[in-house]
């Protein structure tokens, strides 16, 4: 028997990809995510290709995964895809110890982030 299939959380014209545990602070990752929000996917890929930020490589990989999900799993047209959402969340924070003078210590925080990219198929109206 088994449980019935859960309904799809996204509309039929959307696909998403999630990159978890990226070793960067959410604030820095959000700078790159804001760069691609609302753009066509080919423009967003070009922007990420030439971005000087280190995390842009991981964001590009996640965007390519979202495009592949849209094409292979949901039969969407790649040429009509737009980045509808790109949002960042906090993951765990590694805490490390840094020895300082006079027997003291300082805490080093190494944050991790999660990135979710949602692409939407926007049909061009025939003029």
Curated annotation (Swiss-Prot):
CDD domains: Ribosomal_L22. The keyword Ribosomal protein applies. InterPro entries: Ribosomal_uL22, Ribosomal_uL22_bac/chlpt-type, Ribosomal_uL22_bac/org-type, Ribosomal_uL22_CS, Ribosomal_uL22_sf. SUPFAM superfamilies: Ribosomal protein L22. Disulfide bonds: none annotated. Keywords: Ribonucleoprotein, Ribosomal protein, RNA-binding, rRNA-binding. It holds the Pfam family Ribosomal_L22. GO terms for biological process: translation. GO terms for molecular function: rRNA binding; structural constituent of ribosome. GO terms for cellular component: cytosolic large ribosomal subunit. This protein binds specifically to 23S rRNA; its binding is stimulated by other ribosomal proteins, e.g. L4, L17, and L20. It is important during the early stages of 50S assembly. It makes multiple contacts with different domains of the 23S rRNA in the assembled 50S subunit and ribosome. Belongs to the universal ribosomal protein uL22 family. Part of the 50S ribosomal subunit. This is Large ribosomal subunit protein uL22. It comes from Methylorubrum populi (strain ATCC BAA-705 / NCIMB 13946 / BJ001).
């Amino acid at each position: 028997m088994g449980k019935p299939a859960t309904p799809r959380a996204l509309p039929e014209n959307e696909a998403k990809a999630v990159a978890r545990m990226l070793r960067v602070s959410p604030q820095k990752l959000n700078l790159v995510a804001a760069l691609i929000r609302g753009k066509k996917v080919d423009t967003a890929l070009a922007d990420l290709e030439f971005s000087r930020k280190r995390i842009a490589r991981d964001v590009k990989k996640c965007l390519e995964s979202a495009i592949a999900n849209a094409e292979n799993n949901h039969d969407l047209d790649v040429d009509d895809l737009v980045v509808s959402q790109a949002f960042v969340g906090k993951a765990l924070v590694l805490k490390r110890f840094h020895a300082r003078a006079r027997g003291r210590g300082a805490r080093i925080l190494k944050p991790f982030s999660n990135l979710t990219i949602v692409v939407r198929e926007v049909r061009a109206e025939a003029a």
